[in-house]
Swiss-Prot record:
Xref: CDD domains: IF6 (cd00527)
Pfam families recorded: eIF-6
A biological process from GO: cytosolic ribosome assembly
Taxonomic placement: Eukaryota, Metazoa, Ecdysozoa, Arthropoda, Hexapoda
Protein name per Swiss-Prot or TrEMBL: Eukaryotic translation initiation factor 6
Protein family per UniProt: Belongs to the eIF-6 family.
Molecular functions (GO terms): ribosomal large subunit binding; translation initiation factor activity
Signal peptide coordinates: none
Quaternary structure note: Monomer. Associates with the 60S ribosomal subunit.
């Protein structure tokens, strides 16, 4: 299922939100309606946490995470870091990264297994991504754009990339990521996919301007119509237990 929401009359909901299979971050200061939309859908399954990073609300663009971890920029204060550590599941590793390209959400796209990163990302940051998020890392561009985190959205079920991504590039990326990919838009034609939507393995939230056609493409490629949180979390728990044993 893909649900339409707005953050204070802004359709770029992916700028103010970070959604994974084990937690959801929502910027402090949004309307209560925005927060409650996430709480209503996710509250029984994963924690929905109010958070800011470096005093900024654009947490979706500044952070990157998956079920294993969360990377935050160097501008994150000690208090903000402590709040995240107190609020997220113990199994989620939180790490503050010293990286020149500090809008981590713009330069990294990931699911629970692989990450696409900006070609100029520090080597040390690449190693941190692999270690904390437990993913295989690939330096990549999307439709000749280095901001892979802005122009690609991934889950473990599928992915969506910039509408100008060639078929050949889609095929290469798909085999690299091992998930089906589609080129598409959100918010009535916006190419900046990650600004307009967030997705995990059973649910997506999109900007209010997103058309019915865009929603049906999103639900199809991310396999949201057949996904149930209960089955997903059961699988995740089994995987986590397996990891720990």
């Amino acid at each position: 299922m893909a649900l339409r929401v707005q953050f204070e009359n802004n359709d770029d909901i992916g700028v103010f939100t970070k959604l994974t299979n084990t937690y959801c971050l929502v910027a402090i200061g949004g309307s209560e309606t925005f927060y409650s939309a996430f709480e209503a859908e996710l509250g029984d399954t994963i924690p929905v946490v109010h958070a800011n990073v470096g005093g900024c609300r654009i947490i979706g663009r500044l952070t990157v995470g998956n079920r294993n971890g969360l990377l935050v920029p160097n501008s994150t204060t000690d208090e903000e870091l402590q709040h995240l550590r107190n609020s997220l599941p113990d199994a989620v590793k939180i790490y503050r990264v010293e990286e020149r390209l500090s809008a981590l959400g713009n330069v990294i796209a990931c699911n629970d297994y692989v990450a696409l990163v900006h070609p100029d990302l520090d080597k040390e940051t690449e190693e941190i991504i692999a270690d904390v998020l437990k993913v295989e890392v690939f330096r990549q561009t999307i439709a000749d754009n280095s901001l892979v985190g802005s122009y690609a959205v991934l889950s473990n079920q599928g992915g969506m990339v910039h509408p100008k991504t060639s078929i050949q590039d889609q095929d290469e990326l798909s085999s690299l990521l091992q998930v089906p990919l589609v080129a598409g838009t959100v918010n009535r034609g916006s190419e900046v996919l990650a600004a307009g939507m967030v997705v995990n393995d059973w649910l997506s939230f999109v900007g209010m301007n997103t058309t019915a056609t865009e929603i049906s493409v999103i639900e199809s490629v991310f396999k949201l119509n057949q996904a149930q949180p209960a089955t997903v979390t059961t699988k995740l728990r089994a995987a986590l237990i397996e990891d720990m044993s």
